[in-house]
């Protein structure tokens, strides 16, 4: 038998030199690195279970930051290279900073992720009784397929501000002994009329009512006995009355925990991975950032799922104001610092799904296990509502990733004219900063249970880390 290795043909050599040859990360990475990815995602799963809302994500980020030596930001203070600090915006967004050796005039390296996710928010007057069942009226937040959110165990998170100004934290449905809540649905035997509705109306917004109780208060002198009984329970537990719902922010989210998916445990399934998969990886990158050349920031922001409007979203001015305050101490203009800066908009993309392949253009779609995905633009139709990263900046990011052996890919959000979406990249770009979306491909995005690859998640962490180290 001839044991000589077959020599490559001229065509094979030329193809190897000239043509793209993307490979699954599971084939590119060593077993040791795959084990590192798996271990990294254990911490990620814990984060998903702890930080199910934007407020909880900020609380967890602060706890981890302080453990890593970060201090609260002091406006007007002159910071030295290596100093680490954080700024919290209204309890719903956070900026974490590590000062670099170069001056701020050389710009900032920024990773920007969002920590809000689709959910069901309680209305301001949510509590009612109907046919001796007690329910909460909800108003869905973000873009959802409403039918996916019925018959799912839900927990309730948020804050209630009482009439005297006291703030009460609510978190019920997460502990194993807690009750859960649920949006009901009609049985198939009686669903003839429902099944004739168009898919977007299969479940209507006003039908997303959360079932919260059924036992009456034992007093024939009162009406709405079940409602009264539920309110009595809430009063005993939290000290609130019905009018306190007016000044409350309560969010119903899926109650199940993050879990490994697949016989090979290669994926993570959980609520809220858009965009907490990028929030966690960007957070870990800044926490482990030491003595960077350039000043580095991770921003975890709110309101992306509803357009980034509001004073905790990146369509507001809190980020440029923060940079301006920081720059002023060094005699610099904030706008000049921003213009010299670079950002990875840390947001997810849709992973190619072979079961639902029609909306995807396979040559330009991201895939599970092919690494972190760089998305040059998002938007819709003729690239409306997006930042389109320049070839020069894409080339800069490409070179950075390749030099550091990051497993990465490119992807668009589906076919042209097939729909669309947006990220915070457009608002960062509007500040006059170079930016490109870099994130993790997600299956079943915006569903109560989303799926990501452990390899892709780990590569996102490595991608943000090399930006900070550059």
Residue ranges and their predicted role:
Residues 1-470:
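N-terminal hydrophobic/helix-forming segments and targeting peptides
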């Amino acid at each position: 038998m001839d044991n000589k290795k077959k020599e490559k043909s001229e065509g094979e050599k030329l193809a190897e030199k000239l043509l793209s040859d993307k490979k699954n990360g599971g084939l590119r990475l060593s077993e040791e690195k795959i084990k590192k990815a798996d271990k990294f995602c254990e911490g990620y799963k814990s984060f998903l279970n702890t930080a199910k809302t934007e407020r909880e994500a900020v609380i967890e980020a602060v706890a981890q930051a302080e453990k890593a030596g970060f201090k609260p930001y002091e406006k007007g203070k002159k910071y030295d290279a290596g100093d680490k600090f954080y700024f919290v915006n209204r309890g719903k967004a956070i900026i974490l900073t590590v000062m670099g050796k170069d001056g701020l005039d050389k710009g900032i390296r920024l990773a920007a992720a969002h920590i809000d996710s689709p959910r069901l928010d309680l209305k301001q007057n949510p509590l009612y009784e109907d046919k001796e069942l007690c329910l909460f009226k909800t108003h869905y937040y973000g873009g959802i397929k409403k039918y996916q959110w019925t018959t799912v165990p839900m927990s309730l998170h948020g804050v209630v501000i009482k009439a005297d100004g006291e703030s009460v934290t609510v978190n019920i449905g997460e502990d194993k002994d807690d009750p859960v809540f649920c949006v009901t649905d009609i049985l198939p035997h009686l669903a003839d009329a429902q099944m004739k509705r168009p898919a977007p109306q299969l479940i209507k917004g006003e039908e997303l009512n959360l079932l919260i109780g059924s036992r009456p208060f034992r007093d024939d002198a009162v009406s709405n006995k079940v409602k009264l009984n539920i309110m009595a329970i809430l009063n005993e537990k939290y000290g609130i009355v019905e009018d306190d719902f007016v000044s409350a922010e309560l969010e119903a989210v899926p109650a199940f925990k993050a879990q490994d998916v697949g016989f090979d445990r290669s994926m993570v399934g959980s609520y809220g991975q858009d965009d907490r998969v990028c929030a966690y990886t960007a957070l870990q990158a800044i926490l482990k950032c030491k003595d960077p050349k350039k000043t580095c920031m991770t921003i975890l922001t709110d309101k992306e799922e509803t357009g980034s409007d509001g004073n905790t979203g990146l369509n507001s001015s809190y980020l440029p104001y923060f940079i301006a305050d920081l720059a002023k101490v060094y005699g610099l203009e904030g706008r000049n610092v921003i213009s010299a800066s670079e950002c990875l908009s840390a947001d997810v993309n849709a992973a190619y799904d072979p079961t639902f392949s029609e909306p995807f253009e396979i040559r330009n779609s991201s895939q599970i296990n092919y690494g972190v995905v760089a998305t040059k633009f998002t938007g819709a139709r003729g690239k409306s509502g997006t930042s389109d990263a320049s070839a020069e900046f894409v080339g800069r990011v490409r070179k950075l990733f390749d030099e550091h052996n990051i497993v990465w890919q490119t992807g668009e959000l589906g076919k042209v004219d097939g729909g669309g979406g947006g990220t915070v990249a457009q608002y960062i770009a509007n500040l006059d900063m170079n930016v490109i979306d870099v994130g993790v491909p997600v299956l079943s995005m915006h569903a109560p249970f989303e799926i990501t690859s452990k390899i892709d998640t780990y590569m996102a962490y490595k991608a943000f880390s090399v930006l900070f180290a550059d």
